[in-house]
């Protein structure tokens, strides 16, 4: 339809994949034509922060004058100067790469949606797993034309197409292994999985997806192993150096804790990590070539592998692509997701959606069931997560997320803003915007009843920048979350901007910043 198009992708790996796809259908990238006069031409241009300044500015000019009407890029492409009723697309609309780390902390999703509204264009949010934000916006009860967005509608793949294109996905939890009479129940890789993966290795590569490298700690019930959460805001709890237990989100102290599931009163620390996975798997699959692809390894992320029997161990986002001579040789014969239980202890507000996105991304590299592809989810996890993966139905999880956030007064059902900086500066800003006791934004009405609009403030680490070290050693840098109904989101933003401007204009001491709807609340 001769419309300009802007596509924002998470990383350069996705840009390279999309560039190769566009080349395969006859489109050319913006590059020198080889003529003596040094002319550049092409059907699409790439914008990203890794480009040389001259190349980036040349592509920017070609886009602004209309020479190139299709733009690919990372977050930097959200400001591509296209005109007319353009098509604005974003892949993985809740990934952390979409958020700008500089003031005013613009998010690629919000910028593209606003531009689509202003240009009378179309905004499309694509992802392996639907985000809670997209689910809420496409809900019939919330669809409408606002100042920053137009009407939204959900798009689903047809069930018949999904079934044919996806592999056979099985969840090997304790109940399923007991039904199969597997003698290795409780093993990290049970005998049933070893047998399936060994058979798949006879005809091609096999992918094993493991959690991110590194060690993190989480508190869980010592009996049922469910993650310990705050009774006030459902945030994750942490144990401080002095033994005190508090919420990471609202800072509330926890005493006389009791598990709501099994009524146990004892906690345990769970350390989540992936060290030593390659050596452990080498003993299970002797004589099989192995490829390790993680950002922390000396070799780093492996971009691609050949179609040959080999075992590939990769963390989410670092899965190598399979390169072969035909489409049937550009896929893994089987995919296994190890340590599914780590999903029970993730602490981010989008933790389940991020987990499902990573699982679906890995499984999408597997051969479809029509060509014998199988995917295994190994370990205990939330049944909703497992069913969403097995049925390839991410809206199932997204709907549960929206319902949970309606009860806990969290975005997208409610609007939220983070305020952080020196303790007295944060307190002054909260008072000026009316979020403290006695103000007109001090409480919110939720399904569970009326509750304070502010979570926190809680202490946060000192910044890494040299020019903000005046609070070093004082533990006086804090963060708070302010929540309001979506109808008052614009009002909250204006109040925060006004209070921040007053802080700067009056030369009041101390760091003070705010951000609307950040991915990580605390």
Predicted regions and their residues:
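Conserved Walker A/P-loop ATP-binding site and its immediately adjacent core
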Residues: 4-26
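Accessory helical-bundle/CTD segments and flexible terminal tails appended to RecA-like ATPase motors
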Residues: 1, 153, 158-181, 285, ...
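Conserved helicase ATPase motor motifs in RecA-like P-loop NTPase domains
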Residues: 96, 101-142, 146-158, 212, ...
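Cys/His-rich short segments
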Residues: 188-192, 196-286
